């Protein structure tokens, strides 16, 4: 779910920046170095426009290790319905991957 939202957001940004109305799936794949650079540049451009400006903001760069870790995590995630510890109500989905919990309401 989180990856879907991220891809839709990136697709919208890439459509605006390229001025196109239709994209092939290959145009959105983050395995493409051109797309990686476009994402990084857009992210860093947006961060430069922060007001007031941050004094210690680091420049973002692409990390292959993190890409592999995220890909593995996204294919191995097992969703479970989460319940509130006191009320017992169903409160959303929890994905477990490599000992990390991701909670989506």
From Swiss-Prot:
**How does it get modified post-translation?**
Contains 8 disulfide bonds.
Q: In which tissues is it expressed?
A: Expressed by the venom gland.
Q: Does the keyword Cell division apply?
A: no
The principal localisation class reads secreted
Record has Signal as a keyword? yes
Q: Which family does it belong to?
A: Belongs to the CRISP family.
What does it do?
Blocks ryanodine receptors, and potassium channels.
> How is this protein named in the record?
Cysteine-rich venom protein VAR2
What is the organism of origin for this protein? Varanus acanthurus
Kindly list the organism's lineage: Eukaryota, Metazoa, Chordata, Craniata, Vertebrata
